[in-house]
């Protein structure tokens, strides 16, 4: 069985948070209904996957893994999957080969995770998403599929009531987004885990629902995340730089991402941080960790809300 890619584990320092403001009562759902939808991927080169026009993976995603869909969907219904393949930067490639494209295998499916035993139950990935490969090598490859979700036991508001940010003046929007990131940078660099928790409260609440967390799991994650921010981020954030603004979810979500490829970073090689959030803290000896935030602007409001990673 392939390794399940739990985003909240891979990005532990970036995970959900809640404390004493805006908490909600977590409704417990029976184990047999705790469905997590996913895309099972086998590939020999890095790829990027989008779910409902939201980037769900990075180029450094482990090969041969699975991507959870729950963070990127709000309710049952049609879900759009998009695959992108670029030439391999670290190898100096300029084309994506037909062979590499054809060796990408994607399957849609679901599973249930028993958190008490850490067992993966009812794992099935039996709906193939067939690749239509070109006849010659190409500078870039992209393909989309639609899948249907029918068994989610919840419905979330998420970014559904957000403004269409495509209608904003791009320069004005970017100025506003950068100002918000600067505020987040200072919070992280000061090690203010409590303030981070308050700003990510809505994300925390919805994460608890789509990952079927118990009250205890939720509070433990919040506590650990605050401690990690205090321990690892204080006076350890790199400058906020080399970024570009990205819109997702058909203009409902916005973020900043690093725009330049790297072959190494902070004494770790290879490490390509293109596409990362620019909210980056250096590792103690090498490498780095980053703090993803996807923002939306509620209708009738002028204040961003952090809703996903």
Language-model segments: residues:
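A glycine-anchored, Pro-Gly-centered beta-turn/N-cap motif
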Residues: 64, 70-77
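Beta-strand-rich recognition domains
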Residues: 19-47, 84-190, 194, 199-214, ...
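Sec-dependent N-terminal signal peptides
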Residues: 4-13
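A short, sequence-level motif marking secondary-structure junctions
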Residues: 61-65, 129-130
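Short, well-structured beta-strand segments within conserved domains
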Residues: 74-86
């Amino acid at each position: 069985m392939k390794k399940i890619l739990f985003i909240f584990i891979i990005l532990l320092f970036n995970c959900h948070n809640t404390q004493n403001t805006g908490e909600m009562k977590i409704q417990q759902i029976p184990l047999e209904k705790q469905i997590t939808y996913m895309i099972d991927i086998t590939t020999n080169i890095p790829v990027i996957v989008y779910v409902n026009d939201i980037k769900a993976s990075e180029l450094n995603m482990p090969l041969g893994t699975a991507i959870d869909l729950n963070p990127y969907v709000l309710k049952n219904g049609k879900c759009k999957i998009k695959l992108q393949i670029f030439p391999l930067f670290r190898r100096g490639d300029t084309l994506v080969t037909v062979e590499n494209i054809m060796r990408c295998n994607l399957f849609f499916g679901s599973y249930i995770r028993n958190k008490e035993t850490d067992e993966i139950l009812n794992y099935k990935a039996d709906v193939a998403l067939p690749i239509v490969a070109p006849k010659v090598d190409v500078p870039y490859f992209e393909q989309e599929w639609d899948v249907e979700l029918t068994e989610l036991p919840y419905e979330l508001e998420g970014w559904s009531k957000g403004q269409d940010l495509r209608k904003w003046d791009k320069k004005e929007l970017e100025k506003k987004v950068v100002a918000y990131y600067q505020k987040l940078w200072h919070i992280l660099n000061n090690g203010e885990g409590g303030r981070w928790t308050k700003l990510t409260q809505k994300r925390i609440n919805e994460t608890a629902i789509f990952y079927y967390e118990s009250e205890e799991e939720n509070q433990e994650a919040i506590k650990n995340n605050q401690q990690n921010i205090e321990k690892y981020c204080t006076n350890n954030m790199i400058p906020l730089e080399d970024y570009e603004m990205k819109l997702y979810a058909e203009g409902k979500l916005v973020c900043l991402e690093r725009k330049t490829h790297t072959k190494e970073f902070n004494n770790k090689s290879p490490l390509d941080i293109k596409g990362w959030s620019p909210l980056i803290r250096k590792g103690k000896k090498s490498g780095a960790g980053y703090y993803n935030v996807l923002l939306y602007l509620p209708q009738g409001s002028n204040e961003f809300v952090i809703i996903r990673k």
